[in-house]
Amino acid sequence: MTRIYGIILILVKFIQTTTPIQICDIGASPVDKTEFIEILLDKTNSNIIGFEPNKDEFIKLEQSSKKKFFNYAIGDGKVHNLNICYAPGMTSILKPNYEYLKLFHKFDEWSEILKVISIQTKKLDEIYFDNSLDLIKIDVQGYESEVIKFGDDKIKNSLVIQTETSPIPLYENGKPFSYVCNQLENLGFNLHMFSKIHNRSFKPMIFNNSIYSGLYHLFQLDCVFVKNFKEIDELDEENLKKLILIMFYSFKSYDFVDLLVSKLEVKTKKNYLNQYRDLVKTLKMQKLY
């Protein structure tokens, strides 16, 4: 057993793919860690192609034979203004929703627009990839719905979508969690889990001596959408294996993986389930919420 990034991982050697898992990172700024991607790159046969429009953040990205990044935005294919904010993680095509953000600590500072640059966006569906996308991460600060709208063909043919949304939009003209959820459900996905739940406290209250802590209010949700069960039953062996590896390494959804492995066993007539369950007995599991 190896402890990496604070969690216990064991390599699933008995489940291997013949083609790489293709990851697509839309909004690839390194300002927020993406451990769920790094683990997959480290532990499986996988590659990543990413897109980041903010030049200052783009130049921080590490390129390699497995990591290719491009300095442009994914969207509706039109020219837009990119609002560069004081906090790089708040930079967006959309303008911050100041009336809402001012209710919380520090966001009036973090959301300040320092400069505006004109950018040409590209539709996800118009970008050529050597292979179909398996895991798509969308972190575009309120612009998720447009990425999905103009990338629905690529998205509906993928396996897992990880996206950051908010029940109440943090940006003007942004769509709420419910809207994005409906978009992805219409493309054959179900909401499986929240990989992170971000709470914030309303000013002036502070919890745990930290402005980053909240009591109950749901500020942002890192959502994991997975192919619905009908779609899963129609996956071929290769894609089912990819889904298993993504859900095992990236999201630690061990009971769901058990279900997927049982489906793989039926499909291939090979004994995977006993090996997997022996492996699971050695894992230390912890609920996120």
Stretch-by-stretch model annotation:
Residues 1-289:
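Phosphate/nucleotide-binding beta-alpha loop and adjacent structural elements of enzyme active sites
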